[in-house]
Amino acid sequence: MKIAFLTPEFPHPKMGSSGGIGTSICNLSRGLTQAGHQVFVLVYGQSEDVIFVENDITYYRIKNIKIKGFSRFLTQKKIEKIINLLIKNNNLDLVEAPDWTGITSRIRPNCPVVIRLNGSDTYFCHLDKRPVKFLNKFHEQRALQNADALLSVSHYTAEVTKQLFSLNRNFQIIPNSIDLEKFSNDHSIGFQENTILYFGTLIRKKGSLELPLIFNEVYKHNKQAELILIGRDASDILTKNVSTWEMMQPLFDGEAMQNVSYLGSVSYDKIKEFINTSTVCVFPTFAEALPVSWIEAMAMQKAIVASNIGWATEVIDDTVNGFLVHPQDHENYAKKIIQLLENEALRHQFGIEARKKIAQKFSIEVVAKQSADFYKKILQ
């Protein structure tokens, strides 16, 4: 098959920064290519129009058209034209796009369009308990209604999305994936005792403002505990504060703060090094669809304490391959971290079970086959 992915982001030096959507598309593209399918990646919002081929994947960098009042519509029509040329010249079979801001709301190419839920703006605003922009919800709803087929990375995201948009349609559930070969624990490096790692954007919805209160409880019990924070610092929508990190700092107890290191954004490879050497990884998030960061840490056989909200049980089995605790239950969350810091055997057990779960459910081979089988059904 010949498949195109339309995306606002992709983890490539030429494409700018990327989050979970880009990472999941990158992994799926590699899996499909390895299985013999031809993949095109169309990245809009770029600084220039460029086409290049790398590792058997054809990339289209697409520059948005900017004319006041018509930018979105004209950019959509430009994308539609590119897709139709791929159909004409390369026999493209279908195009897949994320639900985020409904980019395909006015894109009607001469092939099936698949929408994969990684979490729309409407979805995240709902989880964040804040209002969604009217136009964003309008375009997201229209894109979902117009799609020929719908996928979701988790049951939870599918059910919440159906309620929010009053959709009477079924979703095929296919999770995000990772390349297990790229995420394995390097035992030769060893790990640093008593290190607690959080990697991801510093932002309210990821539980960043709960982390200081959780770590204060850990530090009371274990004065050797160290919290390492990795990721870009985001502004806070509710308070209009330009820095979540600035908001976090006063929440730490004075002594505990001395054991906190914020390293900002680091390279993908460097993140893997920090995962490898950490004792425990923590993810006290309030809003996700299906977090790639959890899967990456589990693949590297790390003991995890994560949020118990919604999607969580589709990734982690509580007490089997990690602990699940509500982010605002600070004392209990801290107790689980302390338990793992003090119990090497339990950390090892969780790590073994975690990687086993990832291999069975979230490897690029498994997810690429599920996706390809789904695409074939659409094309029949």
What are these regions (language model features)?
Residues 286:
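Aromatic "clamp/platform" in nucleotide-sugar-dependent glycosyltransferases that forms part
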Residues 189-206, 212-215, 227-230:
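Conserved donor-binding/catalytic core segment of Leloir-type glycosyltransferases
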Residues 77-78, 111, 123-142, 180-184:
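Nucleotide-sugar donor phosphate/pyrophosphate-binding loop at the beta->alpha transition
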